[in-house]
UniProtKB/Swiss-Prot annotation:
Enzyme class: lyase
Family note: Belongs to the ferrochelatase family.
Amino acids binding Fe cation: 214, 295
Keywords associated with the record: Cytoplasm, Heme biosynthesis, Iron, Lyase, Metal-binding, Porphyrin biosynthesis
Physiological role: Catalyzes the ferrous insertion into protoporphyrin IX.
Catalytic reaction(s) noted: heme b + 2 H(+) = protoporphyrin IX + Fe(2+)
The protein's name in its UniProt record: Ferrochelatase
């Protein structure tokens, strides 16, 4: 194996600790070409689509990308912000917020982000952190619930990059934080803040809160993936924090792709049923998404909203994701700090010397 060319190691005093936030990814632009390039990388991941590679590539290249690229580009264009993709914009704000919080607490760590698909990639960012002097790196996936198709593939990509390094940094990983008290508190704070600004649903009159998590094929649950259990755990803890019952609050799964059975109940049909049953108001919150993106803004805020209203519902609210809220940055800082314990994250005091 040929290893990457590296510059000589630096003086030990420059060796630093780094935190790398990792999210799924986003196209570089809301254009068919950029979206096809992004989807080709995303849907070629064997942890995302567990179908024999040769058969799947034929289906992907001939039947999916030529059509889905253009359709998805229109959806991305509908949510694109002046600064760029919502996921990238909010992720960069999370990096800024976490970096500032750690600096206030005298941490000298580097903080940056990478995307599993698209740019900036995980291998490129690991190399960039090494060049900046990082000898220890904490991989912090922005997926609170562990799944093979999200958390594991991010770690795969990082470890593959390490295989090509002659001088590897020390690595720690955050596997999941689905039940972390700070994360649950940040979720509850986000919901309460929205209700304070827009009014609380009248649960006594039948209004509902729906907690929508990203779906995965049901087959992964049967094969031992803990994602479903951890989503249920997060949902139950959030309901408890909000003092809601399972009648007032539902847990659903969105973003189904293909014809196979995915985790149920599905989000869109659930909202359609609620609207048809006479539910006046439905609020939807996505606890598994730490930053707003296509799946929350367009799928929930537009498509699912229309399903509910067309079925007879009167008032639909999409509660924004955690994004860079003060409560989430504080929670993120707490989770990161706990996982940095034992590493030299604070500057050593400069020895005081006296003249002769």
């Amino acid at each position: 194996m040929r290893f990457d060319l590296e510059r000589p190691s630096q003086n030990a005093t420059s060796h630093r600790v780094a935190v790398l936030l990792i999210n799924l990814g986003t196209p570089d632009a809301p254009t068919p070409r950029a979206v096809r390039r992004y989807l080709a990388q995303f849907l070629s991941d064997p942890r995302v689509v567990e179908i024999p590679a040769l058969l799947w590539q034929i289906i992907l290249r001939l039947l999916i990308l030529p059509f889905r690229g253009s359709a998805s580009a229109k959806k991305y264009a509908a949510v694109w912000m002046p600064e760029g993709s919502p996921l990238r914009v909010y992720t960069e704000k999370q990096v800024e917020g976490l970096r500032h919080l750690l600096q206030l607490n005298d941490y000298t760590v580097l903080v940056d982000y990478a995307m599993r698909y698209g740019t900036p990639g995980i291998p490129a960012m690991l190399n960039q952190l090494k060049l900046a002097g990082a000898e220890r790196v904490l991989l912090m996936p922005m997926y609170p619930q562990y799944s093979s198709s999200t958390t594991a593939t991010a770690f795969d990509d990082a470890f593959s990059a390490l295989k090509r390094m002659r001088n590897q940094p020390e690595i720690r990983t955050v596997r999941q934080y689905a039940d972390h008290p700070a994360y649950i508190a940040a979720l509850a704070a986000q919901v309460h803040q929205y209700w304070h600004q827009h009014g609380r649903p009248d649960f006594a009159a039948g209004d509902k809160l729906v907690l929508s998590f990203h779906g995965v094929p049901k087959r992964t649950l049967d094969l031992g993936d803990p994602y479903h259990e951890q989503c249920q755990q997060t949902g139950a803890l959030l309901m408890q924090a909000l003092e809601l019952t399972p009648v007032e609050c539902r847990i659903t799964f969105q973003s189904r792709f293909g014809k196979a059975e995915w985790l149920q109940p599905y989000t869109a049909p659930t909202l359609k049923e609620l609207g048809a049953a006479g539910v006046r108001r439905a609020d939807v919150f996505c606890p598994g998404f730490t930053a707003d993106c296509l799946e929350t803004i367009e799928e929930i805020g537009m498509e699912v909203r229309d399903e509910f209203l067309h079925a007879g519902g009167k008032d639909f609210h999409r509660i924004p994701c955690l994004n860079a809220s003060q409560a989430w940055i504080a929670a993120l800082g707490e989770i990161v700090a706990q996982n940095l314990q034992g590493w030299p994250v604070q500057a050593l005091p400069v020895p005081h010397t006296t003249g002769a």
